[in-house]
């Protein structure tokens, strides 16, 4: 018998047996490798997950810090702006009694007396100059009558019945008020109209 004609006891050629055994070994190895995951792969996956979480935490921290720095910068700018805007408040408060005194001097001065005319004119010019200067720095006078009572700028000291002025409107200003850049530094003392009973 030649080698090609040799048969195994099962009746299969030796090449067929080797091929079948090789296929069985490969299928067993692939089944085992599918069941057994390399522990290094698990460690790599765990480390990648931890790295991703750490990156996300760091990104959040950086974003929070940027937002906090932006808020701090904005608050600082606002504080500086307010400091510049209202730096004159103390000075203006000290100047108000002087302006009030000039106003009162004009009210009581006898304007018909020719001997006093020059003095009255001097007081008027001084008061006008002083008011012009303080207006340049954001000071506004609150002295309007027949306007609605505004508790932000008016302090009502009396209520008087009136037919000429609408109820809850300023009837008379007893003492002028002042604002500095929109902030009330002294409320105007006013008499308020009320409806006749």
From Swiss-Prot:
Task: Please list where the region (Disordered) is annotated.
Answer: 1-43
Q: InterPro entries annotated for this entry? A: GrpE (IPR000740), GrpE_coiled_coil (IPR013805), GrpE_head (IPR009012)
Where primarily located? cytoplasm
The entry's localization annotation reads: Cytoplasm
What keywords are assigned to this protein? Chaperone, Cytoplasm, Stress response
Q: How does it assemble?
A: Homodimer.
Under the heading Pfam families, the entry gives: GrpE
Gene Ontology CC terms:
cytosol
Top-level taxonomic group: Bacteria
Instruction: Tell me the protein's name.
Output: Protein GrpE
Classification via PANTHER family: GRPE PROTEIN, GRPE PROTEIN HOMOLOG, MITOCHONDRIAL
- Would you kindly state one Gene Ontology biological process term found in this protein's UniProt entry? protein folding
Family label? Belongs to the GrpE family.
């Amino acid at each position: 018998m030649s080698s090609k004609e040799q048969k195994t006891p099962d009746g299969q050629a030796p090449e067929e047996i080797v091929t079948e055994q090789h296929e069985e070994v490969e299928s067993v190895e692939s089944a085992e490798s599918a069941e057994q995951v390399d522990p290094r792969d698990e460690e790599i996956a765990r480390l990648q997950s931890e790295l991703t979480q750490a990156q996300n935490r760091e990104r959040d921290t950086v974003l929070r810090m940027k937002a906090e720095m932006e808020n701090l910068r904005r608050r600082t700018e606002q504080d500086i702006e307010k400091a510049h805007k209202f730096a004159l408040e103390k000075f203006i408060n000290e100047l108000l009694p002087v302006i009030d005194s000039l106003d009162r001097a004009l009210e009581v001065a006898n304007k018909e007396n020719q001997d006093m005319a020059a003095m009255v004119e001097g007081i008027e010019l001084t008061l006008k100059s002083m008011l012009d200067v303080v207006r340049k720095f954001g000071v506004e006078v609150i002295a309007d009558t027949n306007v609605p009572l505004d508790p932000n700028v008016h302090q009502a000291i009396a209520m008087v019945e009136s037919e000429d002025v609408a109820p809850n409107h300023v009837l008379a200003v007893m003492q002028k008020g002042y604002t500095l850049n929109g902030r009330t530094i002294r409320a105007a003392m006013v008499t308020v109209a009320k409806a006749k009973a």
